């Protein structure tokens, strides 16, 4: 098959959805399929794969200064020449809407994967998440030709609402929007039963939903030599290990802040990964005098 995978934030960004998309592309290609990734153009990154199609983008200062896809009339038509057999959106934003338009134009199936508990990010990225929900509240019904989805509270209402009430309101709104997008697709994929249940119960998902965890290429780790590890375990030591991108929503800071409350000095914390939060985490460990633990 010729497959188009649509994603709103791809390389050089480092996060789980981008990694999952790359793994999916490679796995499908290994099975003999022809796979294209459609993503916003990056001004700082050159692709070495002619099966990555970049669409126009603009820097979005609300969304962490990332390049956001700029969708305009006629863009879906430019992709007609690829004659996809199926499209698969990995995110439900601008480029995700483009996937919807391409599927409609080419009369082909559209599958979407909801990877992220977006509403769990409100505490860590309040401006980014709430601004995104407000923007999608206005734009998504127009793009999908569906009825309006839950009016966003007015500025006056927001002033009188507690933080928890605001979070609950935007959380519910976010799931309704995500499910509304998925309901316009032929099928929805969730990496976990928990996320699928939220989409159905809170979002109102009615499209067929399949739980399919993201895979890991275990061959990359089978050749590892334990003697090369930078971590040396002494007799009697116990390790708390976190393997994740270093970013606020992964809660590594809470692990560091818990270490001073663990009197047993044989217990060590190992954070494995990289990301934008690394320097802040190192500084916090120094402040609490646990950098050697």
Feature-to-residue mapping (PLM):
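Nucleotide-sugar donor-binding and catalytic loop/hinge architecture
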Residues: 1, 224-239
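N-terminal subdomain of nucleotide-sugar transferases
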Residues: 1-56, 82
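Carbohydrate-associated surface elements
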Residues: 41, 194, 215
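Membrane-proximal helix-turn-helix segments that form the acceptor-binding/catalytic region
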Residues: 105, 137-187
